[in-house]
From Swiss-Prot:
Reactions that this protein is recorded to catalyse: Endonucleolytic cleavage at a junction such as a reciprocal single-stranded crossover between two homologous DNA duplexes (Holliday junction)
GO CC aspect terms: cytoplasm; Holliday junction resolvase complex
EC number(s) from the headed UniProt entry: 3.1.21.10
Phylogenetic placement of the source organism: Bacteria, Pseudomonadati, Pseudomonadota, Gammaproteobacteria, Enterobacterales
GO biological process: DNA recombination; DNA repair
Origin: domain of life: Bacteria
Binding residues annotated for Mg(2+) 2, in chain numbering: E67
Record protein name field: Crossover junction endodeoxyribonuclease RuvC
Length: 173
């Protein structure tokens, strides 16, 4: 059993999603958004760090998954996003959590089956996969999708490792 915290970083709204994985079974534990209503970036970063730390304390995840930085047309936006990712990652590392990063395209491909999927498609598939009564908020859905992606990637890595181990055992007999 593993608990995975997914983070969709944003300087105004940072989404989070927490799921439990037991084998191939995924269970929704919680999700939401850290909203920063202050204007100055240092204060926003402080609130995001505190929010992520509080979520980690509440859910006690085993793994931390976050969206990678994408190339933005606006350099200022990309820098702010990088700083938000930084404080979220520091919050995880301070709690001794292993950090995994996934590109937005990989997350959409894993959850929807199309790397260029729309937000509404991600919300719908997250709702379906986690058997939720309604679509989660867009940023929370993205964070849950990141956590789901981590589950699928780690499951595939484990299966490949087991296959290679079994193959090696067969050669040794």
């Amino acid at each position: 059993m593993s608990i995975i915290l997914g983070i969709d970083p944003g300087s105004r709204i940072t989404g989070y999603g927490v799921i439990r994985q037991v084998g191939r079974q995924l269970t929704y534990l919680g999700s939401g958004c850290i909203r920063t209503k202050v204007d100055d970036l240092p204060s926003r970063l402080k609130l995001i760090y505190a929010g992520v730390t509080e979520i980690i304390t509440q859910f006690q995840p085993d793994y931390f998954a976050i969206e990678q930085v994408f190339m933005a047309k606006n350099a200022d936006s990309a820098l702010k996003l990088g700083q938000v990712r930084g404080v979220a990652i520091v919050a995880a590392v301070n709690q001794e959590l292993p950090v995994f990063e996934y590109a937005a395209r990989q997350v959409k491909q894993t959850v929807v089956g199309i790397g260029s999927a729309e937000k509404s498609q991600v919300q719908h598939m997250v709702r379906t996969l986690l058997k939720l009564p309604a679509n989660p908020q867009a940023d929370a859905a993205d964070a849950l999708a990141i956590a789901i992606t981590h589950c699928h990637v780690s499951q595939n890595v484990m299966q490949m490792s087991e296959s290679r181990l079994n193959l090696a055992r067969g050669r040794l007999r």
